[in-house]
């Protein structure tokens, strides 16, 4: 990842953790694999201690927008509770496989 992408991720993480200090964030997808093109988005798994609701999703989406706006990077947060991620059907999904194989914790 580029220095700009790394700084965007740091800014995003700091913003999310202001409200959700226990949040775990993992980059996955083409930018994590290193095969992104300039138009690729930045996929980020966000795992929270609590069940996300509409306000949670709106807040995290706003954090993503704010972090990526100036440098022109589109962040795409995918949000789950820790319980959903570790024990729900997503545990065996293609998304979970991709995160396990290529994910970069931030």
Q: Whereabouts are the PLM-identified features?
A:
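Short beta-strand->loop micro-motif that forms the acidic, two-metal-ion catalytic signature
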Residues: 40-47
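Catalytic core of pol beta-like nucleotidyltransferases
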Residues: 1-24, 33-34, 48-106
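Short edge beta-strands and adjacent turn/loop segments
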Residues: 28-40
């Amino acid at each position: 990842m580029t220095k700009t992408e790394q700084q965007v991720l740091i800014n995003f993480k700091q913003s999310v953790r202001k409200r959700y200090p226990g949040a775990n964030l993992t980059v996955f997808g083409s930018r994590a694999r290193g095969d992104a093109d300039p138009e690729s988005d930045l996929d980020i798994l966000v795992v929270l201690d609590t069940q996300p609701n509409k306000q949670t999703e709106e807040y995290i989406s706003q954090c993503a927008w704010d972090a990526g706006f100036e440098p022109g990077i589109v962040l795409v947060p995918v949000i789950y509770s820790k319980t959903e991620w570790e024990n729900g059907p997503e545990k065996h999904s293609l998304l979970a496989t991709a995160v396990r194989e290529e994910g970069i914790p931030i």
